[in-house]
């Protein structure tokens, strides 16, 4: 768009939803749309323990670290409990397969959480694991994963197991 830049994820989501309304990126029902925006805002600003202790890493498989984090970090338990509550309520209310029935911005917002659950093999309920698997299988998420795997930059401090 002629060099127009938007850098905040919620602003990006709103811009895309307005620019491409035919994709119905937000739920059409006003109450569902408000709830979707609310869970996106919560995701945007919350879950700091999960973010701190389970860094985003699409390439790695770190179940051993996940077990240690799960054992030692009560904040991660609290974050995952809240995430499970959000997801199970929305999946039940809207009938799945995504949080608001069809794919929405809310599912995109939670894709990094799904990735962390996979990377660290964090314990979640079967229903939540099924949702994680559905999100991971989305073509857009698969494209994101492939792009991430093609990157070769890393920070030694964040990824000491990769240091050569």
Locate each region found by the language model.
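Active-site-flanking alpha-helical
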Residues: 17, 113-114, 145
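Acidic/histidine-enriched, glycine/proline-rich intrinsically disordered or flexible terminal extensions
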Residues: 148-164
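GST-like domain detector, emphasizing the conserved glutathione-binding G-site
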Residues: 1-69, 162
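Short, thiol/selenol-centered motifs that function as redox-active sites or metal-ligating centers
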Residues: 6, 36, 107-108, 138
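Short secondary-structure boundary/hinge segments and terminal tails
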Residues: 16-17, 135, 152-154
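GST-like fold's C-terminal all-alpha helical module
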Residues: 43, 47-137
């Amino acid at each position: 768009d002629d060099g127009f830049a938007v850098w905040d994820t919620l602003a990006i989501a709103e811009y895309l939803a307005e620019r491409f309304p035919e994709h119905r990126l937000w739920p059409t029902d006003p109450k569902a749309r408000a709830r979707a925006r609310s869970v996106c805002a919560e995701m945007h600003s919350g879950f700091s323990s999960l973010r701190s202790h389970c860094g985003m890493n699409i390439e790695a498989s770190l179940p051993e670290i996940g077990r240690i984090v799960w054992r030692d970090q009560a904040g991660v338990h609290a974050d995952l409990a809240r995430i499970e509550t959000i997801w199970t309520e929305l999946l039940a209310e809207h009938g799945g397969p995504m949080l608001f029935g069809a794919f929405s911005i809310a599912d995109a917002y939670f894709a990094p959480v799904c990735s962390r659950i996979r990377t660290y093999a964090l314990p979640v309920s079967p229903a939540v694991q099924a949702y994680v698997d559905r999100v991971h299988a989305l073509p857009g998420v698969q494209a994101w994963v492939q792009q991430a795997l093609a990157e070769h930059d890393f920070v030694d401090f964040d990824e000491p197991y990769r240091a050569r």
